[in-house]
């Protein structure tokens, strides 16, 4: 290990190094690994109690662990050998702490004293599949869109919020009319299911629709001061202790690789070897669809399909709960996927009486060899070799950055559902499961997905931004990451003709918010040129001082400057005022700043300034009025 405790592993053959990787992961992160395994198995309630029940029900419903057991049999002989070697390394450390009196492996095990079960190859595959689940939000967005439509938000306002055209004549579709006439808020909930979960869905970690972001970019030999390629990646994970990633160096025979691993998964997810470097950015592929399944009123064990009535597949699961009696849950499955019961994802809000909601997800495949895609990158000697196994990636869907000595490229990988051109909702809201043309038709070929390699600009970049302008059903997604980062990063990369490692690091460490540079002048234009009398006397000086500070600000989110704090508080309050008035409790889904939405509102793109008129008042407010109120509230919360 070096001075930062990063392990460097050297083995004679690959299995030796993977054994040592398992040992090092367990040595440093055993609690993290065991906790993640419990989550994938749907067994967190055993140690955390009822508060983890929703997570356990979701994992059991999606069958994460059993699917991973089946996937183990689909791996190549070499991958299974490496998975077993890794598991043996983990278990060697577990045996040491269990049998040799060398402590418990982590302080948390003094609180949760249950015996640590041996690590199995299935465990690693389950963690990979769970990573795919936590990297998508499409089912939750379908539910949110539906609820917003039912709140009478018209197509133009949905376009403002999601920065994508709404469904054509969305308010006239079969699905909308069906939901509008069928949903009865007082009857949608299965009371016995609802009582099972003690926590409100809006307070659940599963309710968050926002995904972590990532940036990948590279310059080719023609844009490098040394004539070598330079690649960079900064995956933005959620804050956690310990961090999601663990840095490791590995070598065996004449091969070597170094980079970021996820404890429990025997692969370098982001890193480099002697010949290539690789990085990842979430591709935001629409990899989930919800279906409304109509229950046969004459037989509750059957549901309607396009070809007639069919029986639900049914299994039961026992979930043990700390300090409580175990519970039994019934899990049903349709041809479209498992039924989301127990208000998973808040689904009861869009589940009509006499119907269920099922989920199709690309991670539900048994033939999932995603882990091989990353392990093969560790051993690749060129872009072409690295690209060869990317079609194996099922979940999580990613834009993969590859760079060798002479080439750079970004390739979209991960399963993309094939949908019919006649799909009635295009996957934007739940579709009717008994209507033909709504079900999936398999998956797109890897060759059909977007990629860029050695462009004339000598630069490749992705910041979770839109990667294709193809129309449905070849569109990949309707929901993408923001577009501000791609603008800023492209500008910085184009600023220099030739880059060095230092200039790339400088871009990675850039703290200028292009969103702030765009939005602040729109937000403050009237106030900067107004008069002190427009503010209540008690806070005139504070408001004007804040405006003075912001007038000298260049958008740099420097933590030592007061300007970013003033701006962030102001813009957040402004967004809350204009959205919460329209959507009520659903505002919890819009707590993250939405720069494109705010720019549309402040510029009144297609009349979007109508958001500034507060429904709860009789007066007709403008965006200048709301901007002023938001500034006052952000400076002195009790003022309004």
Role assignments for model-derived ranges:
Residues 74-98, 222, 227, 235-238, ...:
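Structured, non-membrane catalytic/scaffold regions adjacent to prosthetic-group chemistry
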Residues 1-230, 235-238, 259, 573:
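Substrate-recognition/specificity elements adjacent to catalytic centers across diverse enzyme folds
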Residues 68-77, 230, 366-376, 469-476, ...:
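Glycine- and acidic
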Residues 209-211, 215, 250-263, 267, ...:
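Glycine- and hydrophobic-rich flexible loops that cap the catalytic core of alpha/beta enzyme folds
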Residues 54, 63-66, 87-88, 372-397, ...:
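Proteins synthesized as precursors that undergo proteolytic processing into mature forms
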Residues 565-640:
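Charged, long alpha-helical assembly modules
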Residues 338-340, 349, 355, 393-496, ...:
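Hydrophobic alpha-helical segments
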Residues 7, 11, 16-65, 279-330, ...:
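Gly/Pro-rich active-site capping loops and adjacent beta-alpha segments
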């Amino acid at each position: 290990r070096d001075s930062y405790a990063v392990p460097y592993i050297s083995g004679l053959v690959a299995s030796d190094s993977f054994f040592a990787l398992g040992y090092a992961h367990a040595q440093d992160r055993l609690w993290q690994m065991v906790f993640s395994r419990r989550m994938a198995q749907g067994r967190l309630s055993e140690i955390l109690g009822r508060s983890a029940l929703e997570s356990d029900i979701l994992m059991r419903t999606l069958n994460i662990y059993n699917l991973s057991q089946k996937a183990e049999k689909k791996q190549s002989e070499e991958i299974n050998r490496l998975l077993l070697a890794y598991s043996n390394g983990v278990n060697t450390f577990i045996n040491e702490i269990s049998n040799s009196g060398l402590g418990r492996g982590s302080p948390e095990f003094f609180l949760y004293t249950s015996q640590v079960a041996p690590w199995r190859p299935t465990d690693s595959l389950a963690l990979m599949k769970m990573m795919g689940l936590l990297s998508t939000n499409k089912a939750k967005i379908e539910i949110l869109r539906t609820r917003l439509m039912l709140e009478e938000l018209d197509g133009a306002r949905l376009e403002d919020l999601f920065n994508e055209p709404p469904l054509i004549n969305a308010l006239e579709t079969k699905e909308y009319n069906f939901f509008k006439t069928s949903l009865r808020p007082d009857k949608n909930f299965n009371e016995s299911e609802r009582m099972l979960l003690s926590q409100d869905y809006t307070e659940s970690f599963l309710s968050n629709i926002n995904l972590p972001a990532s940036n990948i970019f590279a310059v080719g030999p023609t844009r490098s001061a040394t004539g070598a390629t330079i690649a960079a990646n900064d995956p933005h994970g959620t804050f956690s202790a310990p961090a999601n990633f663990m840095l490791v160096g590995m070598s065996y025979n004449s091969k070597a690789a170094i980079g970021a691993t996820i404890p429990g998964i025997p692969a370098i997810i982001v890193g480099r070897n002697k010949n290539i470097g690789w990085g990842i950015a979430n591709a935001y592929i629409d990899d989930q669809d919800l279906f409304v399944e109509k229950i046969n009123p004459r037989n509750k064990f059957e549901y309607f399909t396009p070809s007639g009535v069919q029986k639900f597949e049914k299994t039961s699961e026992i979930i043990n709960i700390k300090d409580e009696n175990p519970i039994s849950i019934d899990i049903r499955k349709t041809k479209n996927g498992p039924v989301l019961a127990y208000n998973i994802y808040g689904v009861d809000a869009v589940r009509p009486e006499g119907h269920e909601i099922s989920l199709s997800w690309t991670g539900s495949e048994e033939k999932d060899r995603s882990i091989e895609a990353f392990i093969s990158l560790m051993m690749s000697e060129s872009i072409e070799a690295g690209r060869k196994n990317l079609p194996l990636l099922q979940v999580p869907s990613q834009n993969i950055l590859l760079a060798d000595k002479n080439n750079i490229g970004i390739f979209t990988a991960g399963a993309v559902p094939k949908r019919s051109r006649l799909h009635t909702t295009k996957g934007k809201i739940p579709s009717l499961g008994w209507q033909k043309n709504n079900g999936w038709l398999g998956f797109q070929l890897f060759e059909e997905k977007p990629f860029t390699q050695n462009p004339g600009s000598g630069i490749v970049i992705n910041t979770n931004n839109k990667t294709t302008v193809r129309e449905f059903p070849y569109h990949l997604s309707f929901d993408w990451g923001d577009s501000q980062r791609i603008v800023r990063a492209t500008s910085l990369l184009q600023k220099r003709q030739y880059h060095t490692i230092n200039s790339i690091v400088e871009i990675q460490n850039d703290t200028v918010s292009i969103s702030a540079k765009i939005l602040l002048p729109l937000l403050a234009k009237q106030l900067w040129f107004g008069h002190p009398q427009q503010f209540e006397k008690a806070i005139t000086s504070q408001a004007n001082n804040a405006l003075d500070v912001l007038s000298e600000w260049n958008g740099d989110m420097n933590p030592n400057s007061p300007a970013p704090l003033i701006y962030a508080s102001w813009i957040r309050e402004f967004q809350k005022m204009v959205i919460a008035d329209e959507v009520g409790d659903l505002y919890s889904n819009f707590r993250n700043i939405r720069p494109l939405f705010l720019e549309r509102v402040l510029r009144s793109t297609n009349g979007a300034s109508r958001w500034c008129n507060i429904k709860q008042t009789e007066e007709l407010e403008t965006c200048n009025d709301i901007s002023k109120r938001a500034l006052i509230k952000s400076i002195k919360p009790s003022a309004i």
